[in-house]
Design a protein with these regions (language model features):
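Amphipathic alpha-helical segments of tetratricopeptide repeats
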Residues: 176-177
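Short acidic-aromatic linear motifs embedded in glycine-rich loops, typified by GG[WY][YF]DAGD(H)
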Residues: 1-124, 128-166, 183-188
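Acidic helix/loop microenvironments that form the catalytic cleft of cell-wall polysaccharide enzymes
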Residues: 190-192
Length: 192
């Protein structure tokens, strides 16, 4: 009974086709605008009202002190490690990375994709991963655990003792090299 495959589960093998890749790429994009694992978009959004506008001094929280009081800590540069906005930003970075990495793993095994579309999707995914880690570097610094599609889930060998800036730049360079401006390849408006 321990060898039974769970029912109702989408495996990477089941998604290793053109349609599955498109679904996974859409899932990666969805992390930009919708909650990932229950986070509040105010707390972790890459649009950065809190971690850009408030933290950078371009915006004020406003309202009264009891309304999103944890934002006051960020605005006053007095953020405690228990501040939920910090946790949610961390979760967002790694949930985005996980979505992108799964899509990249499946993309390599999808045999029914046209090569130019495969390269375009790879470029989009590399851009999204670079964005996620860039957001992480803005809040946590450049020494973050960098997880890419070659890492196994729960890999104990992922360390945070290396500056990941060059890895993020490499993802951006890969994205630029693979993205296309051909409407037939791009597909939907609004993609990277």
């Amino acid at each position: 009974f321990l060898g039974k495959e769970p029912q109702g589960v989408l495996t990477p093998e089941a998604l290793a086709n053109a349609q599955g890749v498109e679904l996974l790429v859409t899932s990666a994009y969805a992390g930009l605008a919708s909650p990932v694992e229950g986070y509040d978009p105010y707390q972790a959004s890459p649009f950065n009202w809190v971690w850009g506008g408030i933290y950078g001094g371009d915006a004020n929280k406003g309202s009264d002190p009891n309304d999103q009081s944890t934002v006051n800590e960020i605005e006053l540069y007095n953020t405690l490690s228990t501040n939920g906005y910090i946790k949610q930003k961390w979760v967002w970075v790694y949930q985005m990375s996980k979505r992108v990495n799964l899509a990249l793993q499946v993309l390599e095994n999808a045999e029914d994709m046209k090569e130019e579309i495969r390269q375009m999707r790879k470029g989009e995914l590399k851009f999204l991963r670079a964005l996620a880690y860039f957001e992480g570097m803005r809040v946590f610094g450049v020494y973050l655990p960098y997880i890419d599609e070659t890492n196994q889930e729960n890999d104990p060998k992922v360390h945070n003792d290396k500056d990941i800036y060059s890895l993020v730049v490499a993802d951006v360079d890969d994205a630029i090299a693979n993205l296309s401006d051909d409407p037939e390849v791009v597909g939907e408006v609004g993609r990277a």
